[in-house]
């Protein structure tokens, strides 16, 4: 394929046929388990507050909004799906487009396909088992292994991430030749993420998928704090062959705590000179009504297909990557 022929698909037709078969297989997986497929908006008047996510913003100027109404493309369908859970829909899944105004590269495209699902009355471990079932079915891989965030740091960096101070984290970063970044960083969680990215991720999931669970409580996001160890959150991530595939939570159901976390995110944004984002008060109001205890996970479908096909880049399994869109 000529590099100048940008009208052509970035993926081959055989790869697109295989991708379609995988999408059918995913839907069958959930249909067989009685999980309802849903569709939620791609745009919202509110967005994520996470300091590490950059959403796309647009403006609606239709009838009744001559002054314009700010809308955000969804980075994930999470907030709307949780409102459906509160409304009583039961277990649900969604295959949808998500958007993040971030990097483009081998494993990234600003527009991508997300698989997200929620299981009322599942704890984190039961959902991890279901994710493992899906990966084995789609990838024909071995059963996954699991280790805690603390175990991962102790095994590969010889440091305890739950007790180490910033000086110790910078010392660990120096061993990875990351002092030029770490020495200027004051946020402890950013230091931990730096160490995880460069010191842990390259070592896990080489032969089989690997679940890393019980992230620090300070990185809980929308997950519950463990009742057994308040230092950690009921959150997990899945890695395979150098790729982060999924991020899951035992979901937070406390409306007040969730609102406080959103507000804390915005304070962190302000401290970093980042724009503060509108909080999704519809989600907060729904949580006040009461969301069933549940666990949920978001999985990158393009990355899953890339692994299933043995492709080198996301663009090999997407009809038109952003540079050809």
From Swiss-Prot:
Record: residues binding substrate: 76-78, 118, 251
Keywords from the UniProt entry: ATP-binding, Ligase, Nucleotide-binding
Catalysed transformations (reactions): D-beta-lysine + L-lysyl-[protein] + ATP = N(6)-((3R)-3,6-diaminohexanoyl)-L-lysyl-[protein] + AMP + diphosphate + H(+)
EC number in record: 6.3.2.-
Binding, ATP: 100-102, 109, 244-245, 300
A Pfam family it matches: tRNA-synt_2
Coiled-coil region: none
GO MF terms held by the record: acid-ammonia (or amide) ligase activity; ATP binding; lysine-tRNA ligase activity; tRNA binding
Nucleotide-binding listed as a keyword: yes
Keyword NADP found: no
NCBIfam families linked to this entry: genX, PRK09350.1
Function: With EpmB is involved in the beta-lysylation step of the post-translational modification of translation elongation factor P (EF-P) on 'Lys-34'. Catalyzes the ATP-dependent activation of (R)-beta-lysine produced by EpmB, forming a lysyl-adenylate, from which the beta-lysyl moiety is then transferred to the epsilon-amino group of EF-P 'Lys-34'.
Oligomeric and partner information: Homodimer.
Name by which UniProt lists this protein: Elongation factor P--(R)-beta-lysine ligase
Organism encoding this protein: Escherichia fergusonii (strain ATCC 35469 / DSM 13698 / CCUG 18766 / IAM 14443 / JCM 21226 / LMG 7866 / NBRC 102419 / NCTC 12128 / CDC 0568-73)
């Amino acid at each position: 394929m000529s590099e100048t022929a940008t009208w052509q698909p970035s993926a081959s037709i055989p790869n697109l046929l295989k991708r379609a078969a995988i999408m059918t297989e995913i839907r069958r997986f959930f249909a067989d388990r009685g999980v309802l497929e849903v569709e939620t908006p791609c745009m919202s008047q509110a967005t994520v507050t996470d300091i590490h996510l950059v959403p796309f913003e647009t403006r609606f100027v239709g009838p009744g909004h001559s002054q314009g109404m700010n809308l955000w493309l969804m980075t994930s369908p999470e907030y709307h799906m949780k409102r459906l859970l509160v409304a009583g829909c039961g277990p649900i899944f969604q295959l949808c487009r998500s958007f993040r105004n971030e990097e483009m590269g081998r494993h990234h495209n600003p527009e991508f396909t997300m698989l997200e699902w929620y299981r009322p009355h599942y704890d984190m471990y039961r959902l991890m088992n279901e994710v493992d079932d899906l990966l084995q079915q789609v990838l024909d891989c071995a059963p996954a292994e699991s280790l805690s965030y603390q175990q991962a740091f102790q095994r590969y960096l010889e440091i305890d991430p739950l007790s180490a101070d910033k000086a110790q984290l910078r010392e660990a970063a120096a061993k990875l030749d990351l002092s030029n970044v770490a020495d200027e960083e004051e946020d402890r969680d950013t230091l931990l993420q730096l160490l995880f990215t460069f010191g842990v991720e390259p070592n896990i999931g080489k032969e089989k998928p690997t679940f890393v669970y019980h992230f620090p409580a300070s990185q809980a996001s929308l997950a519950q704090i463990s009742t057994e160890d308040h230092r950690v959150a009921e959150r997990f991530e899945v890695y395979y062959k150098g790729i982060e595939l999924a991020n899951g939570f035992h979901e937070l159901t406390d409306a007040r705590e969730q609102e406080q976390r959103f507000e804390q995110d915005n304070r962190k944004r302000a401290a970093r000179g980042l724009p503060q984002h509108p909080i999704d008060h519809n989600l907060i109001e729904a949580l006040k009504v009461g969301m069933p205890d549940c666990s949920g996970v978001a999985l990158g479908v393009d990355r899953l297909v890339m692994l299933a096909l043995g492709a080198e880049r996301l663009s090999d399994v997407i009809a038109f990557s952003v540079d050809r869109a």
